[in-house]
Amino acid sequence: MAQETAPPCGPVSRGDSPIIEKMEKRTCALCPEGHEWSQIYFSPSGNIVAHENCLLYSSGLVECETLDLRNTIRNFDVKSVKKEIWRGRRLKCSFCNKGGATVGCDLWFCKKSYHYVCAKKDQAILQVDGNHGTYKLFCPEHSPEQEEATESADDPSMKKKRGKNKRLSSGPPAQPKTMKCSNAKRHMTEEPHGHTDAAVKSPFLKKCQEAGLLTELFEHILENMDSVHGRLVDETASESDYEGIETLLFDCGLFKDTLRKFQEVIKSKACEWEERQRQMKQQLEALADLQQSLCSFQENGDLDCSSSTSGSLLPPEDHQVRSQESPEVQAGSGDSL
């Protein structure tokens, strides 16, 4: 049950500029005061109701750019919420195996997705960056080292702020909460190359192949890359997604190699296009020459036809027989016609 504490929500226009419809905030009348589940948002026009935490931690959802510093009402526009609900229909929860799991592990290569309540049950770790207004969740398998910035998913007193421009929507600025997971990833990339080289030596990969793991590994990598690519296209990629792509592209030289090959492909296609254009030009010239020859042939044919019509159409032998016939026979044959 929700208390009616806000005016009806809907698209309002000021002149010719329509205002984006936002979700309305309500407080459940049956929940204890200050309880994390008491804050809900709904859209009368879209018939949508959602918990504040479910909105804040959904991987593909951010608040509107317009920030209200006078209160704690979040700025979720209805269109973005509908889009996130649609995206969640394809995602199954790693805990309950049901659809609608929009809260994903923030590591770019992890495929786990949750409902917010299922993430709590699975002992997931939440991280809040007060300065940037970001909300991140890590599955138990990829839980970062806990500092004072890391809070458990079971902590109901945690204040949550999220903004598209990475700004606070209300309250004084909080101290930045360090992402230990990102630090750990950087630490991995900064380790001596000997360790990395030892992990990818031929005998190790051969053992993976013998165990049937190599194909599974590469399929998993491709699936993760496809997932990250989808989030980049949808503009829902997280900070970890960008960091993972940056590491993949630049640290191993993949971007440089891909750029070089792409340039070679473009140059090759340009050469093929120029050759094709040259061939088409030759074909046009040949067709023009053929057209000229055809016109010349038709002119010569007309002259032959006119000259032949001035003489007899009968063969020479028939003409001789015809000339030897008597006038009466010729006249009779003419009458019979």
From Swiss-Prot:
Keywords: Activator, Metal-binding, Nucleus, Transcription, Transcription regulation, Zinc, Zinc-finger. Interacts with BRCA1 and RELA. This is PHD finger protein 11. A zinc finger (C2HC pre-PHD-type) spans 25-61. Residues 301-312, 323-337 have a biased composition (Polar residues). InterPro entries: EPHD, PHD-type_Zinc_Finger, Znf_FYVE_PHD, Znf_PHD, Znf_RING/FYVE/PHD. SMART domains: PHD.
